[in-house]
A protein has these predicted regions:
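Extended catalytic core of nucleotide-activated donor transferases of GT-like folds
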Residues: 12, 58, 66-144
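A short, glycine/small-residue-rich beta-strand->loop->alpha-helix junction that serves as a flexible
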Residues: 30-42
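Conserved catalytic-core segment of nucleotide-activated headgroup transferases in glycan assembly
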Residues: 39-42, 46, 156-229
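Short alpha-helical segment that forms part of, or immediately flanks, the ligand-binding pocket
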Residues: 230, 253-257, 271-272
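Aromatic "clamp/platform" in nucleotide-sugar-dependent glycosyltransferases that forms part
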Residues: 244
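Short hydrophobic beta-strand element within catalytic cores of glycosyltransferases
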Residues: 261-264
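A charged, aromatic-enriched C-terminal amphipathic alpha-helix characteristic of glycosyltransferases
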Residues: 300-353
């Protein structure tokens, strides 16, 4: 009888926490050692949306010496959101809690397989999905209840290989830090690549092949805070992007929001926002320098098609509504919590009847 009463009390506590938004939402974040990273910003934006709406998010990191995102994203993300390290300690996870785990933390899934919490894998980079899984392992076999991804193309890919896990799309939002400049662009070209060797090769090849443009400056966008990144981008007249593994493509959209045209290598999975008239998209990265040269000539002659700028603006407008992003995050979590509460209530009814 005492055990039954104890079980009833535990289930009722879970129901109350879910109904009152007190159930914890653990969001795992990668330590970028102070370097800006769009994938990490996305998770923090989710956390802040939940916190603002009265939910109970907790940002989880691996080590006690976590550098954090204060210097590049904003100190408010460190002070307003609770943080917890898992080094040398276990998470206090209750059945009503939610764990949101980026795909790069897949190695943790076997460790939390038997936890009663609701587990979600957050997939922004499809190339990392299988990296930490053993042959034959799937998300469903490791207790994952849901996947969140950023594009319909990635959803299609995930649906094919993780068939028993429902996938929901939550497109990133481009920060309002990125705005069109008030002054004319300078002779600077922004470069953003996944592999830094591509940046080095691009710049050296360009200067060798087109020495007449040595007066132009290339700016490697690596290692900047969000404010520095946005400020630098506003000064540029062109952006160059190389990232074969990109699942979404944040940098081109940030460039478009600043009114900066983009020349880019089409990734292995082409982003759904990419069209032939909102940028210059090519299949062979070795020819990018030639397209850059052609663009420079057109820019110097004031001969860039105005339609490109119009298409850029309409493209990025679809990813600029922060309110809609915040509402989508909260709606998703709220729906999960409502269903969980209903499930616990059914469980409570059965325990009571027995």
């Amino acid at each position: 009888m005492e055990q039954k009463t104890l079980n009833l009390d535990k289930v009722q506590i879970s129901i109350n926490r879910l109904r009152e938004k007190r159930a914890k939402v653990y969001l795992f974040v990668q330590d970028t050692k102070g370097n800006a990273k769009a994938a990490v910003r996305y998770v923090y934006q989710m956390g802040m949306a939940l916190k603002t709406a009265g939910f109970n998010p907790i940002m989880v990191h691996e080590k006690n010496d976590y550098v954090g995102v204060g210097k590049w994203l904003g100190e408010n993300y460190m002070t307003d959101l609770p943080h917890q390290s898992i080094e040398g300690q276990n998470l206090e996870v209750s059945p009503e809690d939610i764990i949101i785990l980026p795909e790069i933390f897949g190695f943790i899934l076997p460790q939390i397989k038997n936890l009663p919490a609701y587990k979600i894998v957050l997939t922004q980079a499809y190339t990392n999905i299988l990296e930490t899984l053993q042959p034959g392992e799937s998300w469903s076999s490791l207790g994952v209840a849901k996947c969140i991804t950023t594009t319909s193309k990635q959803k299609e890919y995930i649906d094919r290989i993780m068939r028993n896990v429902p996938v929901e799309i939550l497109s990133p939002v481009i920060s309002d830090s990125f705005q069109k400049p008030k002054f004319p662009a300078k002779t600077i070209i922004a470069v953003h690549t996944r592999d830094q060797r591509d940046t080095i090769n691009l710049i050296k090849t360009f200067y060798l092949k087109y020495p007449q443009y040595r007066w132009l400056t290339f700016r490697d966008m690596r290692g900047l805070s969000e404010q520095e990144f946005a400020s630098t981008l506003k000064d540029c007249f062109l952006s160059v992007w190389i990232d074969n593994e990109s699942g979404f493509g944040t940098f081109p959209l940030e460039s478009m929001k600043c009114g900066v045209p983009v020349i880019g290598k089409v990734p292995d999975i082409m982003p759904e926002w990419m069209s032939e008239d909102n940028g210059v998209w090519i299949a062979d990265k070795t020819s990018i320098v030639d397209y850059v040269s052609d663009f420079i000539q057109g820019w110097l002659e004031d001969n860039i098609n105005e339609e490109m700028y119009t298409k850029m603006e309409s493209t990025v407008s679809k990813y600029s509504d922060k309110k809609a992003f915040d509402e989508s995050v909260c709606k998703m979590i709220e729906e999960i919590q409502i269903k969980r509460a209903e499930s616990f209530e059914n469980q409570l009814q059965k325990l009571t009847n027995n």
